[in-house]
């Protein structure tokens, strides 16, 4: 049977019988090492008794083996060619057949999903992208969209109102028109405070049985305590803590009148409350706010925090089933805004000239006359309302799960042109520009760009904070920067910046690239500009991103030395803004260029350009402050040695990370992603892990608020020097230990893997 099979098989190759061969690699006697001899099994059987070696092949057998070899070579060649071709097609940029294959694949996808972009073959670099961005922005008339948003169709648009929702839907439709990767809305049910539609708020002067009405204000302060209080009235300048400490009279049991400006309404009220005041009146004085209209009404809020104060630390989703609670930042005293005319009427019944150091007009007086009291009645009511945040995303091409967020407040009490229309208009135009750059010009961001329209910003960044609270556990792992576009143009003279230290260096480089539209000089004018950076305030939507979520944030504006006087008033109109800033279009265009360069730089570069080394100087400054109290610390039997060690570990970790970056293979996306992830952790790890986000939402040890902050630690030591009996040593010991371990934790996170951490702390 085997012989028949062999015979049949051999007939395929010329009819010659095939047999197994045996190769002998034995060294020959003559020394020739290259000779290979073959023995045919059939020949061996015929010559079993002889030692004769068969070395001659028949021609036809040779042809059969040659055919085998040729086929094998061809097959291996084809396999190698296909592997090489496919590998090459993946590595090179889209060319020739690869381009056609990729375009065909993308064309199929676009039929099913209109939001997908068709890749282009061009490759743009930083210089190309800057030029492209500038050209795109030059062709836009920003004032057109600002005027459109200022029409009666969309104003006034208090949070949750029908006009606010109308604008939300308009923005949502535009995002769809821009062909974003995805557009969605975020819905929350929040409690805000509004004026009572039946009972007015009222300020009166009571003198015995006489009641003299001062004003029934149209404006109000949201989240004020509702109720009535009566007492002596005293002036406390701007209502800062220092102002209260320097007063020559007590405010205990009295109402306080303070000027608007310098700090937020909420901080003024909290300070007054801490000095046992029973109520607060806020007005705009002539020097700080040189407005013509003495009876101008204005609006604000008194929540010392952000977000919905009735769901502190957790999101206001409709299905949330937490028991009723409220933020500790809500005031326990009534607060009301009054016009300048009402304030001057009160001053006529007061005595004592205000100090010259206050730099205030002569009408200002200090204390209400004897036998007179002021009565404040606040009838504000809570209202539950639905709010909508609108989002659109351009997904990154390399790391779509890493994103920058660009946002602007949409709502406003009154017309809100400078407060929200400028920022919203800028947001929409930036979204359109980046959509065009990707779909038409070949821009390929490595990371994603999220455009966000927030509402309820007038009540303390409620929309933005609720979104952050809803995704607290994951956002810091994904979002690496927030850019705030609120109030970007309030003047022309100054360019002011508030930001995380991680963004200082990048902002400086952008300022060296962008020119002021009026004088033509670069925005970078002073090598010491970092010292002029202002901290993010509570009423800035970027604040909760930084202090609550640990996401680096930046906010900037073109403005004057004085505050813009019409924010939060019925005169925040397009006509007045264009009167104050005739070059509005150029100023908004420049603000767009600053924001646009931020977006490009942070989504285009392989390295995440966050300067983690900037916190070295912040830590050093903190250590210098502590050194003033070395003797006090020693008296308590404590040492700063471990704090020095933690700061040193942070310095070494930043140096090691910089070295790792310089030594890294920049084309290796996996290596660069690991380095970028370490950089992303820096800001988040400055949030104290030892306090609850519900009890102390702003956990950042540099920019937050509470006993866990570094500033609170220093203040506690100052208190020891002033009044040792009021000093709490146990609290200080906890503050010192937890601050040390928080800083050490940041150093450990920067170091990378656990085996790279110096454990000799």
From Swiss-Prot:
GO terms for cellular component: basolateral plasma membrane; cell surface; clathrin-coated pit; cytoplasmic vesicle; early endosome; endosome; endosome membrane; external side of plasma membrane. The keyword Membrane applies. This is Transferrin receptor protein 1. GO terms for biological process: acute-phase response; cellular response to leukemia inhibitory factor; cellular response to xenobiotic stimulus; intracellular iron ion homeostasis; intracellular signal transduction; iron ion transport; multicellular organismal-level iron ion homeostasis; negative regulation of apoptotic process. Residues 1-65 are cytoplasmic. Residues 87-761 are extracellular. The modification Phosphothreonine is found at residue 21. A motif (Cell attachment site) lies at residues 647-649. Residues 570-761 are annotated as: Ligand-binding. The lineage of its organism: Eukaryota, Metazoa, Chordata, Craniata, Vertebrata. Cellular uptake of iron occurs via receptor-mediated endocytosis of ligand-occupied transferrin receptor into specialized endosomes. Endosomal acidification leads to iron release. The apotransferrin-receptor complex is then recycled to the cell surface with a return to neutral pH and the concomitant loss of affinity of apotransferrin for its receptor. Transferrin receptor is necessary for development of erythrocytes and the nervous system. Positively regulates T and B cell proliferation through iron uptake. A lipid is attached at residue 67 (S-palmitoyl cysteine). Residues 1-67 are annotated as: Mediates interaction with SH3BP4. Gene3D superfamilies: 3.50.30.30, Transferrin receptor-like, dimerisation domain, Zn peptidases. Glycans are attached at residues 248, 252, 318, 723, 728. It comes from Rattus norvegicus (Rat). It is found in: Cell membrane; Melanosome. It comes from the Eukaryota. Belongs to the peptidase M28 family. M28B subfamily. In testis, expressed in Sertoli cells, peritubular myoid cells and in germinal cells. Highest levels in Sertoli cells. CDD domains: M28_TfR, PA_TfR. Homodimer; disulfide-linked. Binds one transferrin molecule per subunit. Interacts with SH3BP4. Interacts with STEAP3; facilitates TFRC endocytosis in erythroid precursor cells.
């Amino acid at each position: 049977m085997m012989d028949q099979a062999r015979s049949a098989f051999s007939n395929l190759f010329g009819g010659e019988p095939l047999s197994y061969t045996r190769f002998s690699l034995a060294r020959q006697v003559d020394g020739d090492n290259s000779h290979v001899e073959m023995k045919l099994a059939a020949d061996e059987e015929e010559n079993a008794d002889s030692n004769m070696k068969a070395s001659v092949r028949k021609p036809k057998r040779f042809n059969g083996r040659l055919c085998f070899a040729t086929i094998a070579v061809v097959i291996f060649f084809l396999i190698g060619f296909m592997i090489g071709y496919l590998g090459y097609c993946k590595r090179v940029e889209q060319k020739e057949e690869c381009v056609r294959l990729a375009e065909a694949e993308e064309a199929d996808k676009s039929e099913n999903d209109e939001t997908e972009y068709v890749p282009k073959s061009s490759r743009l670099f930083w210089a190309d992208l800057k030029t492209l961005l500038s050209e795109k922005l030059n062709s836009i008339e920003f004032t057109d969209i600002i005027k459109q948003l200022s029409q009666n169709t969309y104003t006034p648009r208090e949070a949750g109102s029908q006009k606010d929702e109308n604008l939300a839907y308009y923005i949502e439709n535009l995002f769809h028109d821009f062909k974003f990767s995805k557009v969605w809305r975020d819905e929350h049910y929040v409690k805000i405070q509004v004026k009572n539609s039946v009972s007015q708020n009222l300020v009166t002067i009571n003198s015995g049985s006489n009641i003299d009405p001062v004003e029934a204000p149209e404006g109000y302060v949201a989240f004020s305590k509702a109720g009535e209080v009566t007492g002596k009235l005293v002036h406390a300048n701007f209502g800062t803590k220092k102002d209260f400490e320097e007063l020559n009279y007590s405010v205990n049991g009295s109402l306080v009148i303070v000027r608007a400006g310098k700090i937020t309404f909420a901080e003024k009220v909290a300070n007054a409350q801490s000095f046992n005041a029973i109520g607060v009146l806020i007005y705009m004085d002539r020097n700080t706010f040189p407005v013509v209209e003495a009876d101008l009404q204005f609006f604000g809020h008194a929540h010392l925090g952000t977000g919905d104060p009735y769901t502190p630390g957790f999101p206001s989703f409709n299905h949330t089933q937490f028991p009723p609670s409220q933020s500790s930042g809500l005031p326990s005293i009534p607060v009301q805004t009054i016009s300048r005319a009402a304030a001057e009427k009160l001053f006529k019944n007061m005595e004592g000239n205000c100090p010259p150091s206050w730099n205030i007009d002569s009408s200002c007086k200090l204390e209400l006359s004897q036998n007179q009291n002021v009565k404040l009645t606040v009838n504000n009511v809570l209202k539950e309302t639905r709010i909508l945040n609108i989002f659109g995303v351009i997904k990154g091409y390399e790391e779509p799960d890493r994103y920058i967020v660009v946002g602007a407040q949409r709502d406003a009490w009154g017309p809100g042109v400078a407060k929200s229309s400028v920022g919203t208009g800028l947001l929409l135009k930036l979204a359109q520009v980046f959509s065009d750059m990707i779909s038409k010009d070949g821009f390929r961001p490595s990371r994603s760009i999220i455009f966000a329209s927030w509402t309820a910003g007038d009540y303390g960044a409620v929309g933005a904070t609720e979104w952050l609270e809803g995704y607290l556990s994951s956002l810091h792992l994904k979002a690496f920067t927030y850019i705030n576009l609120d109030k970007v143009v309030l003047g022309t003279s100054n360019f002011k910046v508030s930001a995380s230290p991680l963004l200082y260096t990048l902002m400086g480089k952008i300022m060296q690239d962008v020119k002021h539209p009026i004088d033509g000089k670069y925005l970078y004018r002073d090598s010491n500009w970092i010292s002029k950076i202002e901290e993010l305030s509570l009423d800035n939507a970027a604040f909760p991103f930084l202090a609550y979520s640990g996401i680096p944030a930046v906010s900037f504006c073109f403005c004057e030395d004085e505050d813009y006087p019409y924010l939060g008033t019925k005169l925040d109109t397009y006509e007045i803004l264009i009167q104050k800033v005739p070059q509005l279009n150029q100023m908004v265009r420049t603000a767009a260029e600053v924001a646009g360069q931020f977006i490009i730089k942070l989504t285009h570069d392989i390295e995440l350009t966050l300067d983690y080394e900037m916190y070295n100087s912040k830590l050093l400054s903190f250590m210098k402050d502590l050194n003033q109290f070395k003797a006090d610390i020693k008296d308590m039997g404590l040492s700063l040695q471990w704090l020095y060690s933690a700061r040193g570990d942070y310095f070494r970790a930043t140096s090691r990370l910089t070295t790792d970056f310089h030594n890294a293979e920049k084309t290796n996306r996996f290596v660069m992603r690991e380095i970028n992830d370490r950089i992303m952790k820096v800001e988040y790890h400055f949030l104290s892990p030892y306090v609850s986000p519900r009890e102390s939402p702003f956990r950042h040890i540099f920019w937050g608020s509470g006993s866990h902050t570094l500033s609170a630690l220093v203040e506690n030591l100052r208190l020891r020097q002033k009044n040792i009996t009021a000093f709490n040593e146990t609290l200080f010991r906890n503050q010192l230990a937890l601050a040390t371990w928080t800083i050490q934790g940041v150093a450990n996170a920067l170091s990378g893997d656990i085996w790279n951490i110096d454990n000799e702390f």
